[in-house]
Swiss-Prot record:
Keywords for the protein's UniProt record, in alphabetical order: Cell inner membrane, Cell membrane, Membrane, Transmembrane, Transmembrane helix
Protein name: UPF0259 membrane protein plu2479
Highest taxon of the lineage: Bacteria
GO terms for cellular component: plasma membrane
Main location: membrane
InterPro entries listed in its UniProt record: UPF0259
UniProt membrane topology term: Multi-pass membrane protein
Organism from which the protein derives: Photorhabdus laumondii subsp. laumondii (strain DSM 15139 / CIP 105565 / TT01) (Photorhabdus luminescens subsp. laumondii)
Protein family per UniProt: Belongs to the UPF0259 family.
Length: 256
C-alpha cells in the first residue's frame, strides 16, 4: 500500500493531539532555556549605552556598511558584538537540541508502547544530545549558507537534511552517516517531504508576522511566545518526519 501525505498528516496530528501536554512542555522548556541563555550573553545597560553611542556616532558620520561600523568600534565594543552574536546562536542551538532530542525520544517511546513524560524524554535522549548538537549546527550552517546564496539552495538543503536528526536518534548513526542517508532517502521520497517542509517554513513566517503585529505585548514576552509556537510547529514536523522514516526505512536502507 503506497504511503500518502494525507495519511501521514492525519497520523502526525493525532499523535500531537494525544501527546499535547508533553509536547507543549518540551516546547515551553526549550523556549525558556533559549531565552535564559540568551540573557547571559546580552550586554548590560552600560554596555548597551556604549554600543548605542557608537552606532549614533557612525550614523551621523554619513558612512554606511557593517564593516565600516565594526572598524569604528573600540575593541571592547567589538568584543561585546561578537559575544552577543555567538551567544544568540549558542542559546538557540541548545534550545533546538533539547526540543529535537526530547520530541524524537518521546515519539519513539510512545510508538513502542511506553508512556514517558517530557522530562523523561529529555533524560533518555541525554546521551545523544552532544552528537545531535553537532549535527544541527552543521545542518543549520549549511542551510543558512544556502539561503544567503539564493533562496532555492537553502530550501533544497532543508529538504535533503530533514531526516538526519531522526536517523541519528532512531538508528544511533554518526553525524555524517545520518546526513548521507537523509540525502538519499529525502530525494527518493521528495513528494512526501516537500509539502511538509514548505508548510513548516510558511507557518514560521506567518507566526513571525503575527507576533510582530502584537505591539501591546512586551518584547521579551513576545519573544518567548514566538519561541513556544515555533517549537510547537517544529514538533509537529518532527513527528511527521519520524513517522515517515519508520515507513520508508527498509532493512536495506538502514544498512547504508
Amino acid at each position: 500500500m503506497p504511503i500518502t501525505a494525507n495519511t501521514l498528516y492525519r497520523d502526525s496530528f493525532n499523535f500531537f493531539k494525544n501527546q499535547l501536554l508533553s509536547t507543549l512542555t518540551l516546547a515551553v522548556l526549550a523556549a525558556l532555556v533559549t531565552t535564559l541563555l540568551g540573557h547571559l550573553f546580552i550586554p548590560d545597560s552600560e554596555q548597551m549605552k556604549l554600543l548605542t553611542e557608537a552606532e549614533f556616532t557612525f550614523a551621523t558620520s554619513g558612512k554606511a556598511g557593517i564593516q565600516e561600523l565594526v572598524s569604528q568600534m573600540t575593541p571592547e565594543q567589538q568584543s561585546m558584538i561578537m559575544r552577543a552574536g555567538i551567544g544568540t546562536i549558542f542559546s538557540s542551538m541548545i534550545g533546538s537540541v533539547l526540543l529535537v532530542g526530547g520530541v524524537l525520544t518521546l515519539v519513539a517511546a510512545v510508538s513502542a508502547g511506553n508512556r514517558i513524560s517530557s522530562l523523561q524524554a529529555i533524560g533518555l535522549s541525554a546521551s545523544q544530545l552532544p552528537k545531535l548538537f553537532l549535527l544541527l549546527l552543521i545542518c543549520t550552517l549549511l542551510i543558512q549558507f544556502g539561503l544567503m546564496l539564493m533562496l532555492v539552495p537553502g530550501i533544497i538543503l532543508s529538504i535533503a537534511l530533514a531526516l538526519s536528526p531522526v536517523i541519528m536518534t532512531a538508528e544511533r548513526r554518526g553525524v555524517f552517516a545520518s546526513m548521507k542517508i537523509s540525502w538519499k532517502l529525502a530525494f527518493a521520497n521528495i513528494r512526501l517531504l516537500v509539502p511538509a517542509i514548505l508548510l513548516w517554513l510558511t507557518a514560521r513566517l506567518l507566526l513571525v508576522f503575527i507576533i510582530d503585529r502584537l505591539t501591546f505585548i512586551h518584547s521579551e514576552m513576545a519573544g518567548i511566545i514566538l519561541g513556544v509556537f515555533n517549537n510547537l510547529i517544529s514538533a509537529i514536523l518532527l513527528i511527521y518526519l519520524y513517522r515517515l522514516y519508520m515507513l520508508i526505512a527498509s532493512p536495506q536502507q538502514k544498512s547504508i
